[in-house]
Each structure stands twice: as structure tokens, then as C-alpha cells.
Amino acid sequence: MALAYDGAIQRLIDSFASLPGIGPKGAQRIAFYLLQAPDAESQRLVDAINEVKEKVRFCEVCGNVCESSPCTICSDPRRDHGTICVVEEPKDVMSIERTREYRGLYQVLGGAINPMANVGPSDLNIAQLLNRLHDGEVKEIIVALNPNIEGEATTTYLSRLLAPLDIKVTRLASGLPVGGDLEYADEITLSRALEGRREV
């Protein structure tokens, strides 16, 4: 039987361990760091979490995170409103923005098709994307999903769904490792993938 700490400290460790990318040892280190940290530092963390939960929402247009909807990207008249880059998560928007190469809009799907996790097309923000295509302003959709099985399945689904529309559908060029995440790609690799995109 595994040993556990008493009460509050174990609940804190378990809470951190439930977060993505944090294992039991990392959760324990964070919990004990906070236990020994000055009260002001611990309170800053609590305040930051509360502020995010209170103020941050998803953009009604693209699904990106924002404090006011529509987000700053969707409401920027200097952006190219004729191009939409489709990504899985808000963190992917930031990865592409860091390249300073892309000036269009985004659509955050909120994930990718994954039958093993019971995630189908209706669980994603695909309807939100389709609603944006009715006015004829959008001329190109860039599919920038992670190069893994789920990303490929979603790309195939989107390309078939969008085929009847008079919209160019492209995807990022190779250069991103298969099974990798956009989040971890460097700016140069992403810039080259954007520049070399090809039709689906």
C-alpha cells in the first residue's frame, strides 16, 4: 500500500499530479515548495488562478482564449480576413503567432478527432468554422494540426467537408516531426512550414 501524507498536503499533491505534464514527484516538489514559500508568493498563485477562471473565456468567433470577445486577433482590421488557420488548441495560436509570418485569422477546434477517446467531429468547433465561411470572404483555410494520427484524421475530415466549397484548403509543409506538437516547434520550423504549405 502506498504511503500518503496527511490531509491537506496530500490533497494539494494530488491536485498538482492531476495536471497535464506533472507526475507524482513533480507534484510533491511543487507542493512542498509552496508550503515553504512566503505567503505573498502563494497568494499570488491563488490570485492568478482565480483571475484566469473569472476573466478568461473563449472567443465567440474563433474559439481562442481571450478576456473580451471577440478576441484581439479577430477584431484586428489589419489581419487578413480571407485566410483562416485551423489549429487544435489556443497554445497552437501562440506558437504560430511567434513566427510573425502569419497575418490571417484562426479557428481553434478544441482538440482533434480521436475515436479512442470518444472525440468525434461534433465535439470540436467545426460548426463554428463552417459558420464563418458563408459570406464568401474566406479564400483559404490552412490546416495546421499536430502531425499525429488524430491530426491526420481531422485534416482528412476537414478536407472532405470543405471540398464542395470554393475555398482553397492547404496544410503545413513537412518539417514538423510526425507525432510532434506545434507547441514545441521552433519559430523557424513553423515559418518554413507555413511558407511551404500545400493543397490538401
From Swiss-Prot:
<keyword id="KW-0227">DNA damage</keyword>
<dbReference type="GO" id="GO:0008270">
    <property type="term" value="F:zinc ion binding"/>
</dbReference>
<dbReference type="Pfam" id="PF02132">
    <property type="entry name" value="RecR_ZnF"/>
</dbReference>
<dbReference type="Pfam" id="PF21175">
    <property type="entry name" value="RecR_C"/>
</dbReference>
<dbReference type="Pfam" id="PF21176">
    <property type="entry name" value="RecR_HhH"/>
</dbReference>
<keyword id="KW-0862">Zinc</keyword>
<dbReference type="GO" id="GO:0006310">
    <property type="term" value="P:DNA recombination"/>
</dbReference>
<comment type="function">
    <text>May play a role in DNA repair. It seems to be involved in an RecBC-independent recombinational process of DNA repair. It may act with RecF and RecO.</text>
</comment>
<keyword id="KW-0863">Zinc-finger</keyword>
<keyword id="KW-0234">DNA repair</keyword>
<comment type="similarity">
    <text>Belongs to the RecR family.</text>
</comment>
<dbReference type="GO" id="GO:0006281">
    <property type="term" value="P:DNA repair"/>
</dbReference>
<dbReference type="GO" id="GO:0003677">
    <property type="term" value="F:DNA binding"/>
</dbReference>
<feature type="zinc finger region" description="C4-type">
    <location>
        <begin position="59"/>
        <end position="74"/>
    </location>
</feature>
<feature type="domain" description="Toprim">
    <location>
        <begin position="82"/>
        <end position="177"/>
    </location>
</feature>
<dbReference type="InterPro" id="IPR034137">
    <property type="entry name" value="TOPRIM_RecR"/>
</dbReference>
<keyword id="KW-0233">DNA recombination</keyword>
<dbReference type="InterPro" id="IPR006171">
    <property type="entry name" value="TOPRIM_dom"/>
</dbReference>
<protein>
    <recommendedName>
        <fullName>Recombination protein RecR</fullName>
    </recommendedName>
</protein>
<keyword id="KW-0479">Metal-binding</keyword>
<dbReference type="InterPro" id="IPR015967">
    <property type="entry name" value="Rcmb_RecR_Znf"/>
</dbReference>
<dbReference type="InterPro" id="IPR000093">
    <property type="entry name" value="DNA_Rcmb_RecR"/>
</dbReference>
<dbReference type="Pfam" id="PF13662">
    <property type="entry name" value="Toprim_4"/>
</dbReference>
<dbReference type="InterPro" id="IPR023627">
    <property type="entry name" value="Rcmb_RecR"/>
</dbReference>
